[in-house]
C-alpha cells in the first residue's frame, strides 16, 4: 500500500522574520506546522543570535531553494568593540579585552580593506564540514582544524554609526560570507578586538523587506483560523510568494502548448532565443505558467533540469 502523504500540498515562498535565540531549523519546523505543509525547507541558516529574513520554501518551491542559497545577502550588524570572544559573537566567552584607540581615518581605511573581492577563512563556529562533521562541533571540543580561505565579495560596506563602543555597519555580500568573521577581523585591524552583538539579515536576493512575517504573527493567524472556523488557505496562503520568485533573475523561456507535453515528460525541445550556458525559467503557453528551470543541451535544445509537479490548485 502506498504511503499517504502528510500535510497539504502547498507551494510558495514565505519570507520569515526569524526571532533571535532560535535555530533556523526550529523556525522552519514551526512554519511547516502552521501551514500544515507536506514539505518545507529554508534557504541558508541564520545563527541563533541573528534575526531577519529567512525565506522558507514550501512544497514544490523546495526544488529551487538552492538558488536562494546562492543569492546575495544584506545584513545590519552591530559590533561591540574592545572585546574578542571565542565565537566572534555575544554567545561566546570573552577571551581578550583591549582599549579602544583608533581614529575615524583608521576606521575608514580598515573598512575599505573588506570591500570588493577578498579571501575569507571561515570561523570554527560555522556549519561548514570537515571530514563529515560540522566545524562548530570540533570547536566545542576545543579542537581547531584546517580551513581553506574562500573567495567572497562584499559589494557594499556602509558605516552607519559609532556610539561609544558599539559600531554599526550595513553589509551587502555574496553567499558564504561570514559576518562574524568580518567583525572579528575588523576588530583585529583596529587593534581593539570586536564581536557581534546584533545581526539582522535585511535582504535575500531581491525579496522585499516589508513582506516579512514573524512566527508570532503566524501563530496569531492560526489562532484566528481555529476561532473563526476559517481555513489555512484563506488566512495563511495569501502570505506566500509565487515559487518562481526564487529564480526570477533567470531569463524566461516560454514553451508553446503544443510541445509542452514533451517537455513535461522530461524531453528536450526546440525553442527560440535560448541562451548558452545559462539556466532559464520555463513557462507554458499564453498563461505563462511557471513549470521549472532548464538549460541548453549539447544539441542546442532546451533540456529540463528541475520541473514541478502540476496540480489542480483547487485540489490543494
UniProtKB/Swiss-Prot annotation:
Its EC number is 5.4.99.25. GO terms for molecular function: RNA binding; tRNA pseudouridine(55) synthase activity. Keywords: Isomerase, tRNA processing. One of its GO terms (biological process) is tRNA pseudouridine synthesis. The active site is at residue 47. It is an enzyme of class 5 (isomerase). InterPro entries: PsdUridine_synth_cat_dom_sf, PsdUridine_synth_N, PUA-like_sf, PUA_sf, tRNA_psdUridine_synth_TruB, tRNA_sdUridine_synth_fam1_C, TruB_C. It catalyses: uridine(55) in tRNA = pseudouridine(55) in tRNA. HAMAP family: TruB_bact. Belongs to the pseudouridine synthase TruB family. Type 1 subfamily. Responsible for synthesis of pseudouridine from uracil-55 in the psi GC loop of transfer RNAs. This is tRNA pseudouridine synthase B. The gene is truB.
Amino acid at each position: 500500500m502506498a504511503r499517504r502523504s502528510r500535510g497539504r500540498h502547498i507551494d510558495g515562498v514565505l519570507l520569515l522574520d526569524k526571532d533571535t535565540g532560535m535555530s533556523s531549523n526550529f523556525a522552519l519546523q514551526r512554519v511547516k506546522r502552521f501551514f500544515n505543509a507536506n514539505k518545507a525547507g529554508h534557504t541558508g541558516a541564520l545563527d541563533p543570535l541573528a534575526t531577519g529574513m529567512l525565506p522558507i520554501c514550501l512544497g514544490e518551491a523546495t526544488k529551487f531553494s538552492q538558488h536562494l542559497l546562492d543569492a546575495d545577502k544584506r545584513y545590519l550588524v552591530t559590533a561591540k568593540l574592545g572585546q574578542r570572544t571565542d565565537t566572534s559573537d555575544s554567545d561566546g566567552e570573552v577571551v581578550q579585552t583591549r582599549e579602544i584607540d583608533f581614529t575615524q581615518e583608521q576606521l575608514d581605511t580598515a573598512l575599505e580593506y573588506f570591500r570588493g573581492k577578498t579571501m575569507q577563512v571561515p570561523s570554527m563556529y560555522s556549519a561548514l564540514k570537515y571530514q563529515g562533521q560540522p566545524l562548530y562541533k570540533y570547536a566545542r571540543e576545543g579542537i581547531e582544524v584546517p580551513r581553506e580561505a574562500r573567495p567572497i565579495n562584499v559589494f557594499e560596506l556602509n558605516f552607519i554609526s559609532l556610539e561609544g563602543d558599539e559600531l554599526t555597519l550595513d553589509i551587502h555580500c555574496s553567499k558564504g560570507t561570514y559576518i562574524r568573521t568580518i567583525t572579528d577581523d575588523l576588530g583585529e585591524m583596529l587593534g581593539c578586538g570586536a564581536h557581534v552583538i546584533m545581526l539582522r539579515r535585511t535582504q535575500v536576493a531581491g525579496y522585499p523587506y516589508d513582506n516579512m512575517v514573524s512566527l508570532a504573527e503566524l501563530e496569531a493567524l492560526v489562532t484566528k483560523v481555529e476561532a473563526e472556523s476559517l481555513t489555512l488557505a484563506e488566512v495563511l496562503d495569501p502570505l506566500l510568494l509565487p515559487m518562481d520568485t526564487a529564480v526570477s533573475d533567470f531569463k524566461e523561456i516560454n514553451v508553446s502548448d503544443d510541445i509542452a507535453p514533451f517537455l513535461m515528460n522530461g524531453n528536450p525541445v526546440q525553442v527560440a532565443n535560448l541562451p548558452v550556458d545559462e539556466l532559464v525559467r520555463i513557462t507554458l503557453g499564453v498563461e505563462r505558467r511557471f513549470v521549472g528551470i532548464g538549460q541548453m543541451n549539447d544539441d542546442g535544445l532546451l533540456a529540463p533540469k528541475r520541473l514541478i509537479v502540476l496540480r489542480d490548485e483547487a485540489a490543494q
